[in-house]
Amino acid sequence: MRYLTAGESHGPSLTAIIEGIPAGLTLHPADIDHELQRRQGGYGRGARMSIETDRVQISSGVRHGKTTGAPITLTVINKDHQKWLDVMAVGDIEETLKLKRRVKHPRPGHADLVGGIKYHFNDLRDALERSSARETTMRVAVGAVAKRILAELGIDMLHHILIFGGITITIPSKLSFRELQERALHSELSIVNPKQEKEIKTYIDKIKKEGDTIGGIIETIVQGVPAGLGSYVQWDKKLDAKLAQAVLSINAFKGVEFGVGFDMGFQKGSQVMDEITWTPTQGYGRQTNHLGGFEGGMTTGQPLVVKGVMKPIPTLYKPLMSVDIDSHEPYKATVERSDPTALPAAGVIMENVVATVLAKEILETFSSTTMSELQKAFSDYRAYVKQF
């Protein structure tokens, strides 16, 4: 399985082409639209999300509600493009129109300046448009297809916010996977403690009035993955490493950890390692899951626990100082439309990116020309692991 995305933030559309999806997977536009709508939600989103109503168009690889094994083409129309026809025109236009909405005051924390340097842009909008988080629309669309595969194999997932703008979420003890999932899904903030909703919303409103932004830490949990996915044989075969790369590829993500993560630096080995158990009914298990479901780059059969830290959005309504790329004089950075926070949306993106990596690993590990073939191979492997 592989995919490419294309499109600009204010261009006519966004596109993804996915190759390697088995034939016979039940797939409808509504499956993808559901994830796209989740990405657009969450408290703190800005005006752009009120303009766009993301709906996918499937133009290849699916017939009568089933995948055919051919490449799948997904497209999402940018409604806002109608206001940017001159600025984002494909053909050559008058010089005066080219200067319309030109970006020459790069924003600290964005790809504007370095992208302009790398690709020799006189107008930093050429970097801004592609590096925008709008691209993650298609990462979510691809992830929605991946989640359909995982669902057919009995794998489920959730995400929730652990730290929201410096506020630590108090996680009620002994919540089951399903309880965590339901609480997060029904929260505008993707948190599992409803008692903290008001405090955080008030804080977001305050940050918005100040023209500032906030980030946080997101946790994604995956249930139902058997032991043995990934490999220790080569460095690039380690599944946790693949997940780390994928999570860090999401806009504004600056760190990733598994299980108790960086807290391991303060603990002894006897406190960190997950003791092994075995029962006739369940096979191998663990007393704990401090390592987040990974050993030696391979899954252990425990839930996968992946955490990502998202920096505050770098576009500020009270912009920081920058430099004019023409005169090199100090100047306030360009202001583009932005949100005080996009943490709930980022959680949806992270969840779908993780799903994509896991689906790809499974498709590369098991015979998967068709879904029935994949389901049998995966079921046989689960049975083997249980009796090992």
From Swiss-Prot:
One of its GO terms (molecular function) is chorismate synthase activity. It is an enzyme of class 4 (lyase). Transmembrane segments: none annotated. GO terms for cellular component: cytosol. InterPro entries: Chorismate_synth (IPR000453), Chorismate_synth_AroC_sf (IPR035904), Chorismate_synthase_CS (IPR020541). Reduced FMN (FMNH(2)). It catalyses: 5-O-(1-carboxyvinyl)-3-phosphoshikimate = chorismate + phosphate. Belongs to the chorismate synthase family. NCBIfam families: aroC (TIGR00033), PRK05382.1 (NF003793). This is Chorismate synthase.
